[in-house]
Regions:
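A solvent-exposed, charged loop/short amphipathic helix patch at secondary-structure junctions
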Residues: 55-72, 113-122, 167-174
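Charged, often glycine-rich, active-site loop that binds/positions anionic groups
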Residues: 97, 101-126
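A short acidic (Asp/Glu
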Residues: 54-57, 108-111, 150, 154-162, ...
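C-terminal capping/extension of enzyme domains
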Residues: 1-10, 119-131, 157-251
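Active-site and ligand/interface coordination hotspots across diverse enzymes
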Residues: 1-80, 129-132, 197-204, 234-251
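Short, solvent-exposed loop/turn segments at secondary-structure junctions
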Residues: 47-52, 102-106, 151-155, 216-220
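A structural signal for short, well-ordered beta-strand segments and their strand-loop junctions
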Residues: 42-46, 91-100, 145-150
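Proline-aspartate-enriched helix->loop->beta-strand connector
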Residues: 131-154
Length: 251
């Protein structure tokens, strides 16, 4: 899958000419993507890459493996993620992929709702990006466990479909239990809805995949609220054995 080629097509689409001047700033900044090229057991997702004023504009592609290496330099975003993936006895780094479900660069979280979701062309811009993300997850990564590391992005997986009618990627989710680190769900299929943003995907490769909806994690998040390598490794083991055969109280 040529992610960069598809992003170039999205960023060059004619309908984006109708965006507001403020919304067009994200087009000028370019996009960020992660080079996910193989299957991984664990996928961590954010919502969109940030943009710091001192950063240069342009298209950027990153190697997730290098960003997650233990020896990588300290970073306010990546260091807390790394600490979730290993301890003295467990190392999940090589089993882990990362992506942001959207590719535009913006620090202000209200920008998405204010400038994009409020306009038809903005919604189309979001849908095109989310379609690419879903294909990447389904066809390339095919994870056994997904950590949705941002409450704002949970709805795009289909978590609010029943309560609010928000379909987006439209995964059919069955709640397993609440854990100290977040809500644990299992993917059982795809929601039967014409509103799914990737109707060409008629069957999901992720049946049985566990999804942990947790909070945004940064350097200020209390240590006891961050999922640990031991906990994530246990979830991967549970997924491989079958969640129905595992005592939920052990979580």
């Amino acid at each position: 899958m040529d992610i960069e080629k598809r992003l170039d097509e999205i960023w060059g689409a004619d309908y984006l000419n109708a965006l507001s001047p403020e919304a067009k700033t994200v087009l000028e900044r370019g996009y960020v993507f992660y080079n996910n090229e193989e299957r991984k057991d664990l996928l961590i997702t954010g919502i969109n890459p940030s943009f710091r004023e001192e950063e240069s504009k342009g298209q950027l592609g990153f190697n997730t493996t290098k960003l997650l290496e233990r020896e990588a330099k300290h970073d306010v975003y990546w260091s807390p993620i790394r600490k979730m993936l290993y301890n003295q006895d467990i190392d999940l780094i090589d089993q882990t992929a990362y992506l942001d479900i959207f590719y535009f660069r913006e620090k202000e979280q209200t920008f998405l709702k204010r400038e994009l979701l409020s306009r038809p062309e903005g919604i189309r811009f979001i849908v095109d990006q989310l379609n690419l993300t879903m294909h990447t997850i389904e066809e390339v990564i095919q994870p056994k466990l997904i950590i949705v590391k941002n409450k704002e992005s949970a709805a795009y997986f289909g978590k609010e479909a029943e309560k609010r009618g928000w379909i987006w990627m439209g995964y059919a989710l069955e709640q397993v239990c609440n854990t100290y680190y977040g809500e644990l769900y299992k993917i059982t299929g795809l929601i039967d809805s014409h509103e799914r943003i990737a109707p060409e995907i008629t069957q999901t490769a992720l049946v049985g995949t566990l999804v942990l909806f947790t909070r945004h994690i940064n350097q200020y998040t209390k240590r006891e609220l961050r999922p640990t390598a031991e906990f994530l490794n246990r979830l991967l083991h549970i997924q491989s054995q079958g969640i129905d055969s595992y005592p939920i109280e052990d979580l």
